[in-house]
UniProtKB/Swiss-Prot annotation:
Ecotypes susceptible to C.higginsianum or R.solanacearum, such as cv. Columbia, contain a protein with a premature stop codon while the longer allele found in cv. Nd-1, cv. Wassilewskija or cv. RLD confers resistance. It comes from Arabidopsis thaliana (Mouse-ear cress). The gene is RRS1. A motif (Nuclear localization signal) lies at residues 988-1005. PANTHER family: DISEASE RESISTANCE PROTEIN, LEUCINE-RICH REPEAT-CONTAINING PROTEIN. The keyword S-adenosyl-L-methionine does not apply. LRR repeats lie at residues 498-522, 535-553, 554-575, 577-598, 621-646, 665-688, 742-766, 768-793, 831-854. The lineage of its organism: Eukaryota, Viridiplantae, Streptophyta, Embryophyta, Tracheophyta. InterPro entries: Apaf_helical, Disease_R_plants, Leu-rich_rpt_3, LRR_dom_sf, NB-ARC, P-loop_NTPase, TIR_dom, Toll_tir_struct_dom_sf. This is Disease resistance protein RRS1.
């Protein structure tokens, strides 16, 4: 028995007095209802400055801050809030949940402050939802944040159990929790007990019910659990009844195996009070049936995200380890466990402590071969409860029949003397086997444990009852005699099979060996024999070196031998027990000689046995149901099979030498005669009960007798009277090119009519009233009569149709294919339930309103100029790059009529649309999506003047087992800074699927495309959007209908945005422009600098570059001392950067920078400290002492070469250093400089500086190109104002990071020349190696340059005074 465990940690709620006894009281009560009983609500926000209150917060597991939204977030409030964050830093495991309660105009200010402090868990009251919904959101957040450690994935299941209980009528309610071993039944039951027990007068949780009831007895156990603390022992149920009469009682019986004991236990509880609840957990559904429990909850496995979380916790692996191979290993483990929490946690613990990836992989492979005892014990306890026959069936399925058709398995097992109809149901009830899509499946763990049971019976391979491992089987069957001097010689004695073997399945894909003739001699009880090749590309090589097989076991039920190499089966083989013979691609000429007893034979498949000439023996198999002789090219006749009354299917396709069929059994359902030599069937073969004839006959007389004929294909001449067709339901006249007309078929019962390829057919009088599928592709029909109401598919691909009747009333029509109908002019309407529509290549000028149910639309290449103004397509399965472009183009054709001075009213009339598609169906499409959930772009001036809106593409990763995506949507947030420097945003929510429609099961990844012209920045004067510098940021979040963020269940993996603008007088694909993210290849550092820094002060720029260069998730307290001596205000500077979303500060006080912003900052530094492109022309031209090589050198641009003393004041130009290289044979490095006015004036002047080899006091300066601006005579005020700041920053950077960043590990003692002109802390060192490789490739290195990849980023020359190369030039662009 396990009572609700007392949580050592508690939830601390801080609030103001006004909501303490209203909203907060409801919140605390809701937490208690969820089993979180330790809730402290006595901490008033006004008391947060006192140490006693702070101590309470520090001890809490979760701290909930209920903030008054109607109060201004003043300094007092922020000081109090900071105290909570300080308490949280003292308790690293504590989570902080913020609640902004109450309607307020100050909400944006609060949200800004909370976001600045890095708090992501923010709940706020909204007008559209009640307080109860807000409370439910908070409770779920708190529960999943902290209190479900060890109960991962339980919360959603708790809600389902609670709903199941609430739906039952008042009285004694019962719920069964059912699932496979290790799936989490006990954990779920404990969670339910913890959550609900406080609402009952008495409660008990009896663990391991069968064992407990056996050890303590029923009444003693009940007394102990329901009435704890009583001295007297209750020996009779009457006494217990007196004490608990009419009370509400919660009873949980865990892991019940003996249904009879549980049934007798529950029968004595009819006296419990109304509202009592009895919960039973069991892995056997039969327990619930005997106990009369109808409400059964099947526990499902963990989804992918939950499984990964549990595995990482169990194995103590951090999410951010980042090693791809380690991630792949975790995926394999999770996939193998298939959502079973016990297996995931056990495997995680077994892999814990392995330091090397190779050790973890080896350990996992061993665990798969020999599952841990804890897992085996859990599953074997279910196996031990089975009867002998049930155990045999389970082991047969585990070893041989995984994924096989259930009817096929039942047929074989019946032939073995079992009763599989009943016994397979028992296995299903005990969660050992599942039936899905008419196939038999076992969990991977269950299958491996079943096989482990077989292998654990004995170490001797030849004595194991079932064999499936190829190398073990090869060991038993391989021929072990070799010839020496022409005589057989036994080289060693090999173990052979024994009578214990009952099944042998050999996969020959990777085997080559000779089979001994007596291989099966001792396997007297072998029931199942299958020799096959699972790899169709491999030709198996297994031969009989002696050319004979001595015997086969007479107990065989299944004989499946692909590529059988002999001409016949052993003559002494008795096939009386055979149920199936399956020997495709064999060398058989005949099965055997003489007559054999085949009374049990149901199926024979000898397809593609090209040497087969005789099958007369099959006439003795009176119970035969299927004969498959496809591709038996030498077979000349098919015997009269009139006596085979059970024969249902005959396949003679490809038997080209068969000219006639003498007699067809009366119950035949399928007759395949394609590729035979049969030209006609006698009248006697067409019986009234024939259901299907599949053939290529030229004539079938006597159709009047085929009253039940359902299928007839390739009939070259239609009968003059359709009345003779009786109950024909499928008529295929495909490619009957001479067919010119058909009679009226309105009175027929046809379901399928295929006239495709009937190129001479130009008219049709009427359609059958129950027609479901109509194919008119390639016909000459121009008009069709009224279509039947029952029609589901209409395919007129490539036909000559000019018009169609109104189809709006065809409510069953799902597929409409009009592609290639070049003469089609109009369509009057579409059915409301249409799912697939194809009209690519048509001449339609206008398309009616498309239905919301549409899933597939292909209009590529059509001439349609007008699509509906507003439409939404769901679950597209045909989504390509061209289709996306077509939608963006065709749906926006309207905007070409908008004049340049367009108004908002006209904009509001522009189309909006959305559609979606599974990502796996579009693997070849390139949408230029960027990784992550956000994308940033800069709109150029021409785009801003003609901007209409944006198209958005979002890829969302769904859990593999997630089925109900009805309420899933995407929230898109568009942010920009206006020309006054204020941060602006627009948020739009898009539904992924149409409301009220049935949503199909989503795949792992889904791509959604949205367009809404209102999703655009506001328009200022002259229709120019009010965007400062054109910078726009888009962020995407998965949400539900209550706009609750679903990041914990779904993930936005990639996204992209396209700019939609209007061009006067023309609309083309040029008006749909791809938005580029801040990719270093696509966007230069200077462009990003100008875009992102226009609204920042210089000091804030310095602070941002400092953080982007050296700090990743560092604490504010760590960063602040490093810039202590600088005129930078950390608190205000961080707030400014957070306001413009360049950084955020987490609840732990860590400075967090998104990878996009960090990359942007590095691009700025990269662009200002190292010029990658301009150095190409300057390097190679001036290496005069380098031997000539066959390289393409650029034309020299050398202006002059001068030598000056190292102490010279310089040339009065302002230069910026971008690189330095060691020169082979020289003691001194060479420095490379460019004009500091490159970007502001477009100056391309560069120079190279190197100390002279003969006189180190002299500098050799090579000038390349001329300046295009006058020599600067006065420094900018900005340079003077920032110099001191920059120097201090450099000092701080050098102190804090030189030891971890700037040291060359290959040359630790190599000195760097100091410089005052370039800061020692140049952040260019943080750039990726690929950037340095690109720099080196552009340098066109010759033989005199020391290798390489050595970029001395910080050394400088002493000759330049500080005034010449100020740090401020790094920023003054």
């Amino acid at each position: 028995m396990t009572n609700c465990e007392k949580d050592e940690e508690f939830v601390c709620i801080s609030c103001v007095e006004e909501v303490r006894y209203s909203f907060v009281s409801h919140l605390s009560e809701a937490l208690r209802r969820k089993g979180i009983n330790n809730v402290v609500v006595d901490v008033d926000i006004d008391d947060l400055l006192f140490k006693e209150s702070q101590a309470k917060i520090e001890k809490a597991g979760v701290s909930v801050m209920v903030l008054p939204g109607n109060c201004d977030p003043s300094e007092v409030w922020l000081d109090k809030f900071a105290k909570v964050l300080e308490c949280q830093r003292n308790n690293k495991d504590q989570a902080v949940v913020s609640v902004l309660y109450g309607d307020s105009l100050l909400r944006d200010q609060w949200l800004s402050e909370l976001d600045f402090r890095g708090l992501s868990r923010i709940h706020q009251s909204r007008k559209e939802c009640s307080d109860s919904i807000l409370v439910e959101e908070i409770v779920r957040d708190v529960y999943e944040t902290h209190f479900y450690v060890g109960r991962i994935g339980i919360y959603s299941k708790l809600l389902e159990i609670e709903n199941m209980v609430n739906k039952q009528p008042i009285g004694i309610r019962c719920v069964g929790i059912w699932g496979m071993p290790g799936i989490g039944k006990t954990t779920l039951a404990k969670a339910v007990f913890d959550q609900m027990s406080s609402a009952f007068d008495a409660s008990c949780f009896i663990e391991d019910y069968d064992k407990s009831i056996h050890e303590k007895g029923l009444y003693c156990l009940l007394e102990e659990q329901l009435l704890p603390g009583n001295d007297a022992t209750i020996m009779k149920l009457n006494s217990l009844r007196d004490r608990l009469n009419s009370k509400r009682v919660l009873v949980v019986l865990d892991d019940v195996c003996n249904a009879l004991v549980a049934e007798s236990f529950l029968e004595g509880f009819d006296w419990l009070g109304p509202g009592s609840l009895i919960i039973i957990t069991s892995r056997d559904k039969q327990v619930f049936r005997l106990c009369g429990i109808n409400q059964i909850y099947e526990v499902q496995g963990l989804n992918e995200k939950e499984a990964r979380q549990l595995f990482l916790l169990s194995a103590s692996i951090k999410e951010d380890m980042g090693e791809q191979n380690l991630h792949e290993l975790s995926v394999r483990v999770i996939s193998y466990a298939n959502g079973n929490p016990l297996a995931i946690s056990v495997y995680g613990r077994e892999l814990k402590g392995k330091k090397k990836l190779s050790e973890m992989e080896t350990a996992f492979l061993k665990l798969k071969r020999r599952p841990p005892f804890k897992i085996v014990d859990a599953f074997k306890s279910s196996y031990d409860t089975l009867s002998d026959n049930e155990k045999n069936i389970f082991l047969d399925i585990a070893c041989f029949f995984q994924g096989e058709n259930v009817n096929y398995v039942i047929q074989l097992l019946e032939g073995c003397g079992f009763f599989p109809h009943v016994e397979i149901d028992v296995l299903v009830d005990k969660c050992l086997v599942t039936i899905s899509e008419n196939r038999v499946w076992l969990h991977k763990l269950t299958q491996d444990i079943g096989r482990e049971i077989i292998n654990g019976e004995t170490v001797q391979i030849e004595r194991r009852r079932r064999l499936w491992e190829p190398w073990s089987i090869k060991y038993l069957l391989e021929y072990n005699e070799h010839k020496a001097n022409g005589e057989p010689k036994t080289t060693f004695k090999r173990a052979q099979g024994s009578e214990e073997i009952e099944g042998l399945f050999l996969d020959t894909s990777n085997l080559r060996f000779d089979l001994q003739p007596s291989a099966f001699k001792n396997m007297l009880n072998l029931r199942l024999l299958k020799i096959y090749c699972s790899n169709p590309e491999v030709h198996p090589v297994i031969n009989f070196p002696t050319g004979s097989l001595h015997s086969l076991p007479n107990e065989l039920r299944l004989l499946h031998w692909e590529n059988y190499p002999l001409k016949s089966l052993p003559q002494n083989f008795d096939p009386r027990h055979l149920v199936e013979i399956n020997m495709p691609y064999s060398q058989l000429q005949k099965l055997w000689g003489g007559t054999k007893n085949l009374e049990m034979l149901r199926t024979i498949r000898l397809c593609h046995s090209q040497h087969l000439v005789d099958i007369d023996d099959l006439l003795k198999a009176e119970n035969l149901e299927v004969i498959d002789l496809q591709g038996c090219t030498r077979l000349q006749n098919f015997p009269a099979a009139g006596r085979l009354l059970r024969l249902r299917v005959v396949n003679l396709s490809g038997c080209i030498k068969i000219k006639s069929v003498l007699e067809i059994p009366p119950n035949i359902e399928k007759l395949h005669l394609q590729g035979t030599g049969i030209l006609a069937l006698p009248v006697s073969t067409v019986k009234p009960n024939h259901r299907e004839l599949v053939n290529f006959l030229t004539e079938i007389p006597g159709l009047s007798e085929a009253s039940k004929l359902e299928r007839l294909t390739s009939l070259l001449e239609s009968n003059s009277s359709c009345q003779d067709l009786g109950k024909l339901i499928c008529l295929e006249l495909k490619d009957c090119s001479c067919l010119q007309s058909l009679p009226n078929m309105a009175n027929l019962d046809l379901n399928v009519l295929d006239l495709s390829g009937c190129s001479s057919l130009n008219s049709i009088q009427g359609f059958p009233r129950f027609l479901k599928q109509l194919y008119l592709g390639g016909t000459a029909i121009r008009e069709v009569p009224q279509l039947p109401q029952s029609l589901e598919i209409l395919n007129a691909h490539g036909s000559c149709l000019r018009s169609l009747p109104n189809m709006a009333n065809l409510e069953f029509l799902k597929v409409l294919d009009l592609s290639g109908c070049s003469e089609l002019e109009t369509i009057q309407g579409f059915p409301r339930n249409l799912k697939e529509l194809y009209f690519a290549g048509t001449t339609l000028r206008e398309v009616p309103q498309l239905p919301l149910s549409l899933e597939v639309l292909n209009a590529h290449g059509s001439d349609s100029e007008k699509l509906p103004m507003h439409y939404k397509f769901n679950n597209f399965f045909d989504l390509s790059q061209q289709v996306v472009n077509d939608f963006f183009l065709k749906a926006l054709t309207y905007v070409k009529h908008i004049p340049r001075g367009y108004t908002q009213e006209l904009i509001n009339k522009a189309p909006t649309f959305s559609f979606s598609a599974p990502s796996h169906t579009n693997q070849n499409a390139t949408f230029d999506l960027q990784p992550g959930s956000s994308v940033m772009t800069r709109l150029n001036h021409s785009w801003r003047n003609t901007l209409v809106g944006f198209g958005m593409l979002v890829e969302v990763a769904f859990p593999e087992d997630y089925c109900d995506a009805t309420d899933v949507g995407i929230s898109c947030v568009c942010r920009w800074s206006n020309k006054e420097g204020r941060s602006c945003r627009i948020e739009r929510n898009f539904h992924c699927w149409a409301p009220g429609k049935v949503v199909p099961k989503v795949r792992k990844d889904h791509t959604f495309v949205f367009s809404d012209v209102n999703m655009r920045p506001s328009t200022g004067e002259g229709n120019d959007p009010d965007i400062w510098a054109g910078l726009v940021v888009f962020e995407f979040f998965p949400i539900n209908q209550q706009t609750k963020c679903l990041n914990d269940r779904f993930t936005v993996t990639r996204c992209g945005v396209r700019v939609i603008n209007v061009a006067t007088g023309n609309t083309s694909l040029e008006n749909i422009s791809l938005v580029l993210s801040l990719d270093p290849v696509e966007v230069s550092g200077y462009e990003v600098l100008r875009v992102s820094y226009d609204d920042l002060q210089e000091m804030d720029k310095v602070l941002f570059l400092y953080i982007a260069s050296l700090f990743n998730d560092e604490d504010v307290d760590f960063v602040a001392p490093l810039i202590a001596g600088i005129d930078l205000d950390v608190s205000s500077g961080l707030k400014v950067l957070a306001d413009v979303s360049l950084i955020s500060v987490s609840s732990n006080g860590e400075i967090v920078m998104h990878s996009l912003q960090r990359q942007m900052g590095k691009e700025i530094l990269h662009g200002q400290s190292m010029l990658l492109s301009d150095c190409e022309s300057s390097m190679t031209e001036n290496l005069s002492d380098v031997p000539k090589k066959e390289k393409k050198h650029r034309e020299s641009k050398v202006k002059k070469v001068v030598s000056i003393p190292a102490i010279d004041e310089g040339d009065l130009w302002t230069w910026r250093k971008y690189g330095q290289k060691d020169i082979l044979g020289s003691r001194f490095p060479r420095g490379y400089y460019r004009c500091a006015y490159k970007f502001t004036h477009g100056c391309k002047a560069t120079k190279q500086v190197q100390r002279s080899e003969t006189d180190s006091n002299m500098l050799a300066i090579t000038y390349l190109s001329e300046h295009n601006h006058p020599r600067p005579t006065k420094r900018k005020a900005l340079a003077d104002s920032t110099r001191s700041t920059s120097s201090s920053i450099c000092s701080a950077i050098t102190t804090s990071a030189s030891s971890r960043v700037f040291q060359n590990k290959d040359e630790p003692n190599k000195p760097h020349l100091p410089s005052s002109s370039t800061p020692p802390g140049n952040a260019a060192v943080l750039f990726k190696m690929t950037d340095m490789e690109e720099f080196q490739d552009n340098m066109e290195v010759d033989n005199d340059v020391v290798d390489t990849r050595t970029l001395a980023l910080f050394p400088e020359f002493q000759h330049q005074p500080e005034e010449e190369y100020p740090w401020s030039t790094f920023f003054d662009d």
